[in-house]
Amino acid sequence: MRTHKLLASLAAFVLMAAATLVTLQAKTSTITGGRGAEKSSLAPSSRIREPLNLAILIQDDLVSRVGNELNVTREFIRALPGGSRVMVGYITSGTLQVRQQFTTDLERAAKSLRIPTGSTAASPYNPYVEVREALLRFDTEGTNRNALLLISDGLDVSRGFDFSSSVNSIDLERAIREAKSREVAIYSFYAPSVGLTSWNRRAVSFGQSALNRLADETGGEAFFQGTSFVTFNSYFNKLGQTINKQHATE
């Protein structure tokens, strides 16, 4: 008799504990959005709807704050639709350092991002030679739309420090021609480097004007706000919305 009572009490205790656990899990799910869920930095409308071939190029001598934007950059990559292909590269000391060749493994591409060195030793004379080199890696076949995201200060001082030399540079024009021939739309996020664009307003103006021309003449868009550094969350939201609108009108 005592054994039956003990078993009954134990069963009741187990049921009560299980009910409590379920209640706690439900509350936790409500608060966090589910197990492992994280609040997204990107608006639902910014998620790319159609598969994309995307090359992301980052200038390696950008200010250290750019390193804080890697998480939202990874989030953008991971949110791309299935069938998308991503390449990641860094423009450093006049060379293109490819961290990840074009791949459909979006997680692998996201993990290939690293913090820019943020050193003048990594400064290129201009980013456009490496932009053209990256463009040559796009396939000429396939149905995906082609896009390149350049995160850079845009400044070209290889042939002098003046407006004409920067905005009408030979390397910039070559990059534009290559992008057009391969049907690659170039988008850009402005960020200052540790060099001239971190303190010289003329340099900022030259760089932003060059980025604007590059994007405008290739069917993309340049994103910058004033002359100071701006976090990338709003840029990625606008980028996704812009690409979706362009897809819808094609």
Task: Report residues per predicted region.
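Bacterial N-terminal signal peptides
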Residues: 10-20
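Bacterial N-terminal signal peptides that target proteins for export
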Residues: 2-11
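Scaffold/interface architecture of coatomer-like assemblies
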Residues: 24-250
